[in-house]
Each structure stands twice: as C-alpha cells, then as structure tokens.
C-alpha cells in the first residue's frame, strides 16, 4: 500500500513554520509507517493564542501534581541513605555489605516490574493507576520502620522498588501525551527537580525528625519512614482529580481545548504508526536499535549518578557532626536544581541536546576527578558540588529526547520509557558496591567509575546525534540537515 501523500514545502533552514500533513482518506494497517512532515529536530513555534493558553493550563494542572508525587517518591526512596546516619545498621545488625544490598535490592524490584508496568499503563486509567501504586509504596515505606533484621529490610525494599517502578516512566508517559517535542524537555526537567529537591531537602527535613529519636520507643530512622510514608499516602489521594488520562478525555479542558490538545500532538508526530496492542509496542521498541542506544546512554548516566545513595556518607567524611553534615547535603542539590532548569530551558530554546549533554558531563568528570585528589575540606566540598550539578542536569535531556524520537505509537513510547528507566535503574543494583567503607574518605574507586560512566554517556550522545542527522537527511530528501540537529 502506498504511503499517503504529504504536502511538500521547499526546504529553507531559516523557515521554522510547521509543515501540515494532508488528510488521510484510508488508514494504513497496524504497524505500517505513515510518513510525516517533521524531522527529528522537533522544532515547532507556537503562534496561536489558543495553543499558548492551552499549554499554560496544562502546566497549571499537570505539573504541580506530578512534581509533588515525584518529590515524595524520591524522599521515600532516599530515606535509607539518611537512616544510615541514624542507628539503622546497629538496630538491625547490618554489616557493610548487607546495607549495600538493602540499597541495591530496591532497584532489582524496579527493573523487574518497570517494563510490564508501562505496558499495563496504556490499557488502564493512568491517573488511577499511578495514585494506587503511590498509596501502596507509602504503606511499604511505613512498613520499613517495623523491620527487625536484614531479611525483613530486603523484602520491604524489594517490593518498594516494585511499587515505585511505575511512577517515573508513567509520569513521563503522561507528559509526552500532552506536550510536543520542543515542550517535553523543559517539563521533564521541572519534574526532575522534584528528585533533586527531595535529595536536597531530605537532610534538612531529617534534622527535625531525628529529634524524635526514642519518642514512644521508636528510633529516629523509624520516625523518618513513618512520617514520610504517611504524607505520601495523603498526597496520592489529593492529586488524583488533577491528573488527566488523555487529551480527548480531560475533565478540566473545554471541548475545543480537548480537540486542540489532540490535534497539535498529531501534527508533531514523526513516522506515525497505526496503534496496535501492547505486544506490538513491545516489538516495535525492541526492534528499533535506537532504543538500545538510548538505553545504554541512560544506564551510564544513572550509573554516574550512583553517588546519590551514599551522598550523606560521602559528606560525612568531611569531619563535621551529624547536624552540619545533614545541612551540607543540601546546597549541591539546590545548585543542581537551578542548573537543571536552565540547561533544559536552553536545550529546548536552542532545540539541541548533544552539546548540552557533553558540557554537563565534562563538568561532572572534572568534579569526580577532583574529589579524591585532595583531602582539603573546602576543595572536596567544592568537588561534590561540581559533580552533582554536572550529573543531574542531563537526566531530563536524555529521557525527553528518547520519548520524542521514539513516539511513533503510544504503546511503543510507553515501552521505550520503561526500558530506559528499568535498564537505567539497573545501574543502582551494582553501583552501591563501589562505595566501600574501607575507601573512605577519598572513595577513589567509586569516583573513578563515576567519571568513566560519565564519559560513556557523552560518547553515546554523540553516536545518537550522528544517527539522527543521517535520518534527518533522509526525511528532508534534500541532503541538508535541520538548523539545530540533535
């Protein structure tokens, strides 16, 4: 069957108008590609006041809810790192290796359930699904406080990973269902600041909670899990009314806004494929080699981010007391949050990914190299700030990039996001074992590996750029690339 015709416009590198696809009289069968007018640069320019108003309305309803949920997701997940500064190891009789296993086993659960969960997400009500799993992980977080030994902790942490696995890829799936390619990166960055600020503020929050040590017979680390888990469950219930399922069924949009939200995403598609089953989406994602390039890139990026589960312990090697140590964990992440926002804004504004990733990773490598090179307290803390800001800014760029390039069907996009987040989080299964107590205070082995992972992320970004440049030339048919190729 011949592909439907596409209205042709002469190529002009300075012309940023959207190219409209002619109406289709006959839909191709499932799995057949429909040639689209766009390319992988993803550049569109909003001029319609109705569309501008619509995007602002989407931002007001979607982003605060997803952000609050993700903030608590990471607050609950990172509680184990702060519990190490309390008495969890002593109370549960944990050895160094057992604590590392307790950290890593959460991500084993995450990897196991990540892909099946996102396949389910395309067949259920996403807001209800995400809020239900949030309530479940809140209960499991509270259950952590009642663990009596390493085995109990392993079980709770594993199932906590299973329940937390759907949230982040599910949130990315929702964002990519309502925003165009040029809008996604900034929204993912805003979402990701929830991760950063949770990590930044966790230490400050725990200062107050740790003062409850011994109250009603519970240790400080137990109160940490009880209080944070309770708040998580409450927020899960409160955010449900604000989360939409799809553009055409969103309750708080008018009929005209629903249609506009739907139509603008259709115009933004590349090589659209007719929707199929979840298994069709799985096959499409697995067979597309670009999925695996992005997965390799994201795995190495998160491996370079492996320090986050031990950051309070790394800061503790500076020699300050518990309260000062908790305070000092905050500034690096606050700085990283600001950098992440502006980096993603710049990336979206310039419609560029590779150089932004490159510069960030070079900064991170410098920080990882500097941290073990000296025992000077000021220089080491500066290095911690540098490798934190250099690492965190990249996350939203990679995921936003992948979710827009590989979005030919909803089913494929959901699986791609799940593959990336699952294989990315697989890195957290093995990176905890790089942070050995015997390597304190320099942690030279861990820092060396973090630098190597950063370099591999950088190189894979350049590989993807050249892949998409070649495909852009094929799409345009002129031998020219777009003004801002990825």
Predicted ranges, named:
Residues 185-218, 225-232, 417-431:
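Glycine-rich segments within core transmembrane alpha-helices of 12-TM secondary carriers
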Residues 81-113:
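Extracellular/periplasmic helix-loop-helix junction of adjacent transmembrane segments
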Residues 130, 356-357:
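Primarily marks hydrophobic transmembrane alpha-helices of the MFS/SLC 12-helix fold
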Residues 1-72, 82, 86, 96, ...:
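Intracellular terminal tails of multi-pass secondary transporters
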Residues 111-151:
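Conserved MFS/SLC helix-loop-helix module at the cytosolic interface between two early adjacent transmembrane helices
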Residues 112-125, 338-352:
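Helix-to-loop junctions at the C-terminal end of transmembrane segments
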Residues 92-93, 116, 124-125, 146-152, ...:
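Helix-breaking motifs and short loop linkers at transmembrane-helix boundaries and internal kinks
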Residues 81-82, 280-345, 395, 399, ...:
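Extracytoplasmic gate region of multi-pass secondary transporters
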